[in-house]
C-alpha cells in the first residue's frame, strides 16, 4: 500500500479515487494533484513507481490535509463559540446553523428524539 500524508492509499483503486482517502482531498483536488504531478489518474495505485509516489506526496504536501485541516476546522468552530455569535451559540446548542426550521425535522443535528413526557398523573 502506498502511504501519502500518513494515510494508506488502497492499491486496487485508480490514483484519482485512491487519493480521496486522504481527508481534505476530493475528486477535483485529486485530479489537480495528479495533473500537477504528471501521473495518469487512470493508473492503479499498485502500478505507481517510487518516483510517481514521491511527486504525489510533494503535491499533496502543498495543501492543508488530514490532522492540520481537522484542527483548523475545530479551531474555527471553537472561535465562533467563544465569540458568542449566533453561529457559535447554535454550535453550542447542537442546532442547525443556517436558518433551517427546527420545530420539525433537524433530526440529524439534534439527535434522536427524547421519550415524550407523559402529562397524566
UniProtKB/Swiss-Prot annotation:
<dbReference type="InterPro" id="IPR027437">
    <property type="entry name" value="Rbsml_uS13_C"/>
</dbReference>
<keyword id="KW-0699">rRNA-binding</keyword>
<dbReference type="InterPro" id="IPR019980">
    <property type="entry name" value="Ribosomal_uS13_bac-type"/>
</dbReference>
<dbReference type="InterPro" id="IPR018269">
    <property type="entry name" value="Ribosomal_uS13_CS"/>
</dbReference>
<dbReference type="InterPro" id="IPR001892">
    <property type="entry name" value="Ribosomal_uS13"/>
</dbReference>
<dbReference type="GO" id="GO:0015935">
    <property type="term" value="C:small ribosomal subunit"/>
</dbReference>
<keyword id="KW-0689">Ribosomal protein</keyword>
<feature type="region of interest" description="Disordered">
    <location>
        <begin position="94"/>
        <end position="121"/>
    </location>
</feature>
<keyword id="KW-0694">RNA-binding</keyword>
<comment type="similarity">
    <text>Belongs to the universal ribosomal protein uS13 family.</text>
</comment>
<comment type="function">
    <text>Located at the top of the head of the 30S subunit, it contacts several helices of the 16S rRNA. In the 70S ribosome it contacts the 23S rRNA (bridge B1a) and protein L5 of the 50S subunit (bridge B1b), connecting the 2 subunits; these bridges are implicated in subunit movement. Contacts the tRNAs in the A and P-sites.</text>
</comment>
<dbReference type="GO" id="GO:0019843">
    <property type="term" value="F:rRNA binding"/>
</dbReference>
<keyword id="KW-0687">Ribonucleoprotein</keyword>
<keyword id="KW-0820">tRNA-binding</keyword>
<dbReference type="InterPro" id="IPR010979">
    <property type="entry name" value="Ribosomal_uS13-like_H2TH"/>
</dbReference>
<dbReference type="GO" id="GO:0000049">
    <property type="term" value="F:tRNA binding"/>
</dbReference>
<dbReference type="GO" id="GO:0005829">
    <property type="term" value="C:cytosol"/>
</dbReference>
<dbReference type="Pfam" id="PF00416">
    <property type="entry name" value="Ribosomal_S13"/>
</dbReference>
<dbReference type="GO" id="GO:0003735">
    <property type="term" value="F:structural constituent of ribosome"/>
</dbReference>
<comment type="subunit">
    <text>Part of the 30S ribosomal subunit. Forms a loose heterodimer with protein S19. Forms two bridges to the 50S subunit in the 70S ribosome.</text>
</comment>
<dbReference type="GO" id="GO:0006412">
    <property type="term" value="P:translation"/>
</dbReference>
<protein>
    <recommendedName>
        <fullName>Small ribosomal subunit protein uS13</fullName>
    </recommendedName>
</protein>
